[in-house]
């Protein structure tokens, strides 16, 4: 029997990617997305569903939407995330995160058997927990049994430190177990490209600025905010706006001495001295120093691309630093290279690609949720 699916706040639809990976018989009867670049990406990957975008969720007439069995709603985290202004998600508040309540109409009218919610971990914090409880109560009144869990993608075969809260809801009396976390040997370095264009590498001016700012922070007792990580690690969270902050996703790679300028050589010496002095540890103020990770996991992929730096000194001396490429960020969201190529060939800018990756859901986490939900 074909599973009928509707994805709200779809993005490029990692939910469908997970269902594709399961090889489950499904049909996307509708999706809801207003961001023009996300729509372009979705159309590039799923052209067969191009005419099924119902647009703004607050304006959908659900009477005109075909019935569906699975409804997914990864509503905006803008007003919940610690990276945002935390305006909240009060019903009727007009905030982007408040769009959650627009999903009530779909659930009340269509009564799909399965629901899947995803959002940032902050939704479970004291400030926002009452809203989550209110939503949970609404679903219970509608006859759903609900199961909530915080999952980290690093525990599901993807080397990114990304915690998200998921709620699975099943109509009627039911039981659901989230898949147990498991260890993986996959490291950030396994997802990196071998040949990267020079434009991804930080300029000498930028590197010098980072050094000065690091030294200022260290004098204040805060440690370094500039925290590169080697490829034998887990990536930090992928954000939507890359390289806005020092503690972003950057990679340090080998550089032959004869390619270095005198200034860059001095930079290398300063960084090497920092390593030799053992100045690599996190501070209590969330200010971090240059610290090689040893766990093989990237930090979380976010919309601001600020946390992943890779380093690999040559002869313990020379290296250069670059940011993650858009393709590497998509890989850390567990998107296949085939689908990445479709996105990149659709004319979407690099900035928008970074944003898209940071806004999405890690495919393999969804895969294991669906695997348990549909018992495959």
Give residue ranges: language-model regions.
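SAM cofactor-binding core of SAM-dependent methyltransferases
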Residues: 3-58
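Class I S-adenosyl-L-methionine
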Residues: 60-70, 78-293, 299, 321-322
